[in-house]
Amino acid sequence: METPGASASSLLLPAASRPPRKREAGEAGAATSKQRVLDEEEYIEGLQTVIQRDFFPDVEKLQAQKEYLEAEENGDLERMRQIAIKFGSALGKMSREPPPPYVTPATFETPEVHAGTGVVGNKPRPRGRGLEDGEAGEEEEKEPLPSLDVFLSRYTSEDNASFQEIMEVAKERSRARHAWLYQAEEEFEKRQKDNLELPSAEHQAIESSQASVETWKYKAKNSLMYYPEGVPDEEQLFKKPRQVVHKNTRFLRDPFSQALSRCQLQQAAALNAQHKQGKVGPDGKELIPQESPRVGGFGFVATPSPAPGVNESPMMTWGEVENTPLRVEGSETPYVDRTPGPAFKILEPGRRERLGLKMANEAAAKNRAKKQEALRRVTENLASLTPKGLSPAMSPALQRLVSRTASKYTDRALRASYTPSPARSTHLKTPASGLQTPTSTPAPGSATRTPLTQDPASITDNLLQLPARRKASDFF
């Protein structure tokens, strides 16, 4: 029977054309431990069984519960009965009842093992109790599967074996193509082996032999120019094989179960107190259930509370100020070096620094005085341009000139338009052209009055008072 991949190997390189060579250390170890080739389906099924057993042990139970619920939903009583017989009556219970609380031993006596109490390390009961005789016989005949690492080292699939053989053929072809690279290494190994053997008398008499012994080991693919090859781990051959016990990585029951109520804890405490009766502690004295443990004849005291009572004195008081507080300058406070390390202290400014600050303050004061004086002069000059600021000592001609000059830069009508003014009053002004003789004869008894001229307070006053259109009778 041909092994898997034999046809592929024969196509790549015939067996007769393969150059004989010495196997390397890693290949020799692999050749000694031959793996058993399994069918692809059988290999995957065995691998799945090992992984489910070691890493997912609850899958079988969950799958049975799912089938039981589906049979109950469909009304299949026969299927429900078969599942109940196969997996027992505990299938419907999702969580087991918690075991009785374990009492921690308080003495040095050997703990007693009572009959009927379960131990954590006990093996679970076999689930094949309700199986038929034929099925039980088949399970006994089956060989138990090893661990995952052992299974992978013992068995392999057809695809993996075929791939390994193809890789071996590729290596053989590479060595045949580069035979000159490995020929020197083979010659060196042969020469090294001959040197270790005891030569005959004829060879010892030959004078042309080398005086020195070759100690440098020649290798075609050295570690300098090629990647170093792995060294076979021979240390594990002398040690006991290690394995991972996967069941120890899981809890057999929930350690944080809420089923242990306060009542059960009280029962455990009472049971522990009963066990202490008549027992002797590590100090050689009898244990009293209601008494706290003692060390050297003295019991433990309660931890003092940081918050004192109402009638007790407080731990800290701030004191009272009975007089006017007085500020103490830093220079008057004596400096006490309480710590050996360096301390921070603000020093008083030096004489040079104080003199510089004084000169800077004086220069700033002078600049402020000059600025105020210049501002005052500008204000006086602006005020002298208005008629209100005319001095009575000035001549009338000079006063008229100043008034005429100031009136060029000010518009009274414009100023009155945006400046609120009190109730306007009619001012009487003398006409600039002098007195004029009226054209009409004044009525007897009426005094001659100066014509009234109203000074408009704003340029918008009398804007809508348009002059009336003259008639023809006004020209005759």
Swiss-Prot record:
Tissue specificity statement from the Swiss-Prot or TrEMBL entry: Highly expressed in heart, brain and skeletal muscle. Detected at low levels in placenta.
Keyword Ubl conjugation: yes
Residue numbers spanned by region Disordered: 1-36, 91-148, 413-465
InterPro entries: Nuclear_protein_DGCR14_ESS-2
Polar residues bias spans: 452-463
GO BP annotation list: mRNA splicing, via spliceosome; nervous system development
GO CC, one annotated term: catalytic step 2 spliceosome
Family designation: Belongs to the ESS2 family.
PANTHER family: ES-2 PROTEIN - RELATED, SPLICING FACTOR ESS-2 HOMOLOG
Quaternary structure and partners: Identified in the spliceosome C complex. Interacts with FRA10AC1.
The protein's name in its UniProt record: Splicing factor ESS-2 homolog
Source species: Homo sapiens
